[in-house]
């Protein structure tokens, strides 16, 4: 599986590489708190470059761009030093804005192209930095993915750290190793604060796609009625109108949900973050997506 968070199978991207000119290696990590890929690249820059070369060959691409936030000049220099004049592999600094890590925004920023369904339509394959490192270790050393780098952070964990843990390790043990919780009632998120999923308790295990554990104060259910201010629509990177999708959800109007482009939502969390009524808009849109998908089945 890919290690970028979605767990999309890496091999699928390289099955039909016709027309692919670029491979973009995503080391952006635009979500707050998360620095697991940063730590991985700092420690394994040589493997990252080796993985980039392998991915370039698999995709039969002309150029590989290793995309890193401009706010990490130390990481940029580290990777540039590891390149050692590697042919067709370049470091591409990108702005530190959210959601720069989303593949559509990354393609727009680096290649100045738009596409409909998949990045291959713009002549690109997107791969995560940790995936590139794992590919290098698999090819050179025959190593399987048995460990995962995670960022354990947030206001309610005593000793936040980037940790390397075995896949399948209980989250409760990881939290304990980081000093435990700072208060009795917390909000535990698998992932980052914007796109992560809130988990009821810490009785679950690490999988290969997990990149962070975020521990925040328990959310107060202080939502009020929608003000119809339109901020969720103004800030949606996919150009959707979450307020109208939510209205369609409440009316159970599946055709309207689909018409409003609900399946284009990337669940970035921006609409929930910006909502002055403190409504979990992202969860409403997520529910609408599930309903549309079930109807298609």
Per-range role (PLM):
Residues 61-171, 177-181, 192:
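Hydrophobic alpha-helical positions that pack around
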Residues 18, 43-50, 59, 74, ...:
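Conserved active-site and cofactor/substrate-binding residues in soluble primary-metabolism enzymes
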Residues 210-223, 233, 237-297:
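Ferredoxin-type iron-sulfur electron-transfer modules in oxidoreductases and energy-metabolism complexes
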